[in-house]
Amino acid sequence: MTLANHSALENTIPPANHPYFGHPGCFLKFCNEVRQYTDLPICGVGGLNDPDFVEQQLFDGHIQCAAMSRQLLADPDWVNKLKNGQAKQIYRCVRCNKKCLGGLMAHQGTRCAYDALREKETQKA
């Protein structure tokens, strides 16, 4: 469940400092509204970077699945790290929109501000 405002992309992909959608799980409140009208599974999205928060939303039945874009750009190994008990090593998306949305808008592809840091760590290993 998300929103789309094609005249202002920052409302569709909000940064952490967005006045209305700056908090984790920023679109989840709409999932509860939609739940009143359907029994179909609802997928939540929007600032889902904390595994414990996501798990609680699933457990509470607010969502039946979680979608992540920027978070998986920030740490493509998110799922594997959780599976291997390495949640504290997850790079959490800070929702800066610098390289992901910024790169997309500049036609430079989608990357993440963490890419350089991860590349340095890989070279050290």
Predicted regions and their residues:
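Flavin-dependent oxidoreductase catalytic cores
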Residues: 1-125
